[in-house]
């Protein structure tokens, strides 16, 4: 990364236009830890020798030209690769870059599933437990409208007071008992499950892998060319790119989840009241700097949900929830468990 050598001969020194003199000082440079240091050496040239100096710094360097061709080819190839891996996110219709295959995502999810089971396996409620049946009843309605009923969904309710829930790629759903009191009923639980299901619908896990790989390469090249320290480039990568990207995905999952729960005939207003309770429960713990968080603040989420509520209400009304409840319930049989 650093160039640690002296440029001591005149042919590799940048030429400076000046009036004819019998003696001059030339500069040789050394790049050391990002600082440009110069030392001056006195050299006496006769007037007759002045015209013999060849300013090679003004002559084209074949190596530089070859580097430009290689760099240009990489940029062009990267552009083609980027545009050929663009796709649209379901429901939100956001266009994004994603080069992670379903098989790779599946392998990653299997490893994550093993880790979760090894940590919480002894605290899983049985499938016939009333709490598991309650969560399953709500989740089935969300899955029925998600467009992903063909997955082999698995629900695990964990006996743990932590208010948490998540879905792994492939339909592995984990719900902690601690989230249930905060939901205050099926509509609130639907808001949680729809949000987590939305991450699966949008394939956010795969997109995050693709985004991280791409921006890591860009930051590495920028750090090398600008001579940035490792800590600074790491700071820029995380706080300037990865964390804002994570908050963007969470916001998108809020939107997709709100549409899903509305289409499944749950009350979308429950999503707003859920985050109001979350905001109150966070207290001082929720006062952390926004730029250092992977999730938007509860207040920001509430404001966005308020913007989307009219659309969500229309989605619910067009789903004809009051006349087609039983046909939709019958469709649950088609979901694979």
Swiss-Prot record:
Parts of the chain that traverse the membrane: 69-89
Signal peptide range:
none
Write out the entry's keywords from A to Z. Answer: Disulfide bond, Hydrolase, Membrane, Metal-binding, Metalloprotease, Mitochondrion, Mitochondrion inner membrane, Protease, Transmembrane, Transmembrane helix, Zinc
List the ranges whose topology is Mitochondrial matrix: 1-68
The entry's cellular-component GO terms read: mitochondrial inner membrane; mitochondrion
Query: Which subcellular locations apply to this protein?
Result: Mitochondrion inner membrane
Pfam families reported in the protein's UniProt record? Peptidase_M48
Catalytic residues, per the record, are 196
- Mitochondrial intermembrane-side positions: 90-337
S-S pairs: 265-321
The positions annotated for binding Zn(2+) are 195, 199, 250
Q: Which family does it belong to?
A: Belongs to the peptidase M48 family.
Q: Could you identify this protein by its name?
A: Mitochondrial metalloendopeptidase OMA1
Organism annotation: Schizosaccharomyces pombe (strain 972 / ATCC 24843) (Fission yeast)
